[in-house]
C-alpha cells in the first residue's frame, strides 16, 4: 500500500482529485494494480528498467559535471502518466493549430513580412532575434514548410488547464527516450499496458522518415536521407544514432559530406552518393563555415549554396530559430488570430517582455515572484527562479535585464501539476511537464503522448534532464 501516505498537496495532481484518495477514473486500473504490489516488487521492476537502460546506452551527457561524470542514464520512473482520449484530442487540435501558425509566420517574415506591416509584431523584435537569418529572405523552402519536427512544451496550471510553456522548433530532442520508455514499460508491466488500451507510439520512425522523404527535391523513388550529428560527444548523440537506426538511414558528421557544384554528396565505400534530405541536429551557426561561423568544424562548406539552390532539403529549415525565441513566443496567440482567424486552443503562460518599458519596470519590481528567462537559452540555463533566488542573483539579473532588455522575458510562477513518483521505498508527488512531438510533412502527425519530464528534486519546478530531471512513459488511451 505504497499510496497510503501519499499527499496531493496544494497542486493539481494528475492521479488524485483529493488527499482522501479520490482518483481520476482513467487512473483507477493503474492504481489498483500498483496498490496490490508490495514495495519490493515495484522497486525490483524499477531497478530492472534502470539496468536495461544502462546496458542499452540510453544516456545523455551533462556538461561540466566533474563529480558524477558526463555520461549517465536518463532517470526513468515506472508509474505512467495517463491522458484520456478526450483530453488528448484537444491537445492534438491545439498543437496542429500552433505549428500551422508558426510555419505561416516564418514564411511571412522571410517573404515580405505582412504581419510586421500590419503591426501585429514589431519588426525589431523579429530582426533582432538571435536566430533570424537574413540569408533566408526571399528563399522558398521545400513545400513552404519550415518546422518539420516540433516539440512544444506543455504544462498544467493549478486548475488542470494545459498551457504552452515554450516552442522548440530548431532541433527538439527527447523522442528517443519516449520510444525507449515505452518499450521498457511493455516489458515491465505487460498486463497493465494491455488492460488499459494504450495507443502505440512505435510508428514514429516510419512517420519521421516519410516526413523527410516528402521534402526531397528529387522525385526519386527512394530519396537519400541522412541524420547530421555534431558527433559522439554531443549530449543528444544517443538520440541521433537511435533515430538513424530506427529509420534505416545513415548517421553522418560534417566530414562525411561534401558539396560539389551546388549538390551535396555522402562519402561511401562505393564512392559519392547524392543526398536529398538532411535531418540536421546541428544549429544554423555551425552548418556551413562559408556562410555562418568560419570556425565551425561540424558543418559542410558549400551546404548553404546547395540548399539555397533547392538541391538539398534541410529539416528543420534554416532560420526557424526565430520561432524558438522566447520573445516571439509571446506573440504566437496573435499569430493564430492573424493567420487562422481562430482563438488559440491552448493558451500561453502570461509573459512580460523586457523590451517594453512598462513590462520591464514590473519585472524589476517583482523579481522575487517571477521566473525570468533569457530569450534564447534552453535546458534550464539562463533562468532565474524568483521565489528561490538569492538577493545577489536578483541583482545580477536586474543588471542583465537593464543591459539587454530585448533578451529577457518573465512569467508568473506556474505551479506545474504533480504526478506520483517512486522516491526510494515510497511514493511522493513530483512536478511534471509534457513534450509532445509533432511532424509536419504531407500531413500533420502527432505522436500519442509525448515525453513526460519529471522534476526529481523535491519541490523543484525544473524538469530538464540537464538540471537533474527524469521522465515517465505517457499513455494516451483509446476512446
Which residues does each predicted region cover?
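Preference for protein termini
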Residues: 1-479
Amino acid at each position: 500500500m505504497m499510496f497510503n501516505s501519499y499527499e496531493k498537496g496544494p497542486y493539481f495532481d494528475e492521479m488524485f482529485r483529493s488527499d482522501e484518495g479520490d482518483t481520476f477514473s482513467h487512473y483507477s486500473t493503474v492504481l489498483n494494480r500498483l496498490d496490490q504490489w508490495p514495495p519490493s516488487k515495484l522497486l525490483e521492476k524499477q531497478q530492472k528498467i534502470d539496468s536495461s537502460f544502462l546496458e542499452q546506452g540510453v544516456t545523455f551527457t551533462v556538461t561540466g559535471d566533474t563529480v558524477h561524470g558526463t555520461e549517465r542514464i536518463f532517470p526513468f520512473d515506472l508509474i505512467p502518466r495517463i491522458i484520456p482520449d478526450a483530453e488528448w484530442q484537444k491537445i492534438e487540435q491545439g498543437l496542429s493549430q500552433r505549428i500551422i501558425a508558426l510555419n505561416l509566420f516564418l514564411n511571412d517574415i522571410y517573404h515580405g513580412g505582412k504581419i510586421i506591416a500590419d503591426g501585429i509584431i514589431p519588426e525589431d523584435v523579429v530582426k533582432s532575434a538571435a536566430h533570424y537569418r537574413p540569408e533566408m529572405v526571399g528563399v522558398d523552402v521545400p513545400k513552404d514548410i519550415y518546422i518539420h519536427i516540433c516539440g512544444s512544451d506543455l504544462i498544467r496550471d493549478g486548475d488542470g488547464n494545459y498551457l504552452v510553456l515554450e516552442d522548440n522548433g530548431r532541433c527538439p530532442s527527447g523522442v528517443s527516450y519516449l520510444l525507449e520508455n515505452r518499450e521498457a514499460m511493455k516489458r515491465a508491466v505487460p498486463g497493465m499496458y494491455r488492460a488499459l488500451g494504450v495507443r502505440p507510439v512505435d510508428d514514429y520512425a516510419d512517420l519521421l522518415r516519410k516526413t523527410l522523404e516528402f521534402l526531397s527535391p528529387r522525385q526519386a523513388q527512394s530519396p537519400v536521407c541522412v541524420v547530421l550529428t555534431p558527433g559522439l560527444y554531443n549530449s543528444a548523440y544517443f538520440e541521433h544514432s537511435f533515430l538513424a537506426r530506427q529509420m534505416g538511414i545513415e548517421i553522418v558528421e560534417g566530414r562525411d559530406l561534401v558539396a560539389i557544384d551546388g549538390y551535396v554528396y555522402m562519402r561511401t565505400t562505393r564512392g559519392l552518393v547524392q543526398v536529398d534530405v538532411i535531418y540536421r541536429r546541428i544549429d544554423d551557426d555551425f552548418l556551413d563555415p562559408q556562410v555562418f561561423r568560419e570556425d565551425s568544424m561540424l558543418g559542410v562548406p558549400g551546404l548553404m549554396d546547395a540548399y539555397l539552390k533547392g538541391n538539398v532539403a534541410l529539416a528543420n529549415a534554416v532560420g526557424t530559430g526565430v520561432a524558438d525565441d522566447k520573445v516571439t513566443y509571446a506573440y504566437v496567440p496573435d499569430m493564430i488570430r492573424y493567420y487562422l482567424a481562430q482563438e488559440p486552443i491552448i493558451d500561453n503562460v502570461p509573459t512580460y517582455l523586457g523590451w517594453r518599458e512598462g513590462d520591464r519596470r514590473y519585472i524589476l519590481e517583482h523579481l522575487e515572484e517571477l521566473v525570468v528567462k533569457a530569450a534564447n537559452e534552453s535546458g534550464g540555463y539562463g533562468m532565474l527562479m524568483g521565489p528561490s533566488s538569492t538577493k545577489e542573483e536578483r541583482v545580477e539579473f536586474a543588471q542583465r535585464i537593464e543591459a539587454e532588455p530585448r533578451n529577457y522575458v518573465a512569467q508568473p510562477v506556474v505551479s506545474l501539476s504533480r504526478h506520483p513518483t517512486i522516491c526510494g521505498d515510497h511514493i511522493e508527488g513530483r512536478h511534471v511537464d509534457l513534450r509532445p512531438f509533432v511532424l509536419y510533412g504531407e500531413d500533420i502527425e502527432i505522436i500519442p503522448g509525448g515525453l513526460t519530464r519529471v522534476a526529481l528534486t523535491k519541490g523543484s519546478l525544473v524538469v530538464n534532464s540537464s538540471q537533474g530531471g527524469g521522465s515517465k512513459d505517457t499513455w494516451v488511451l483509446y476512446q
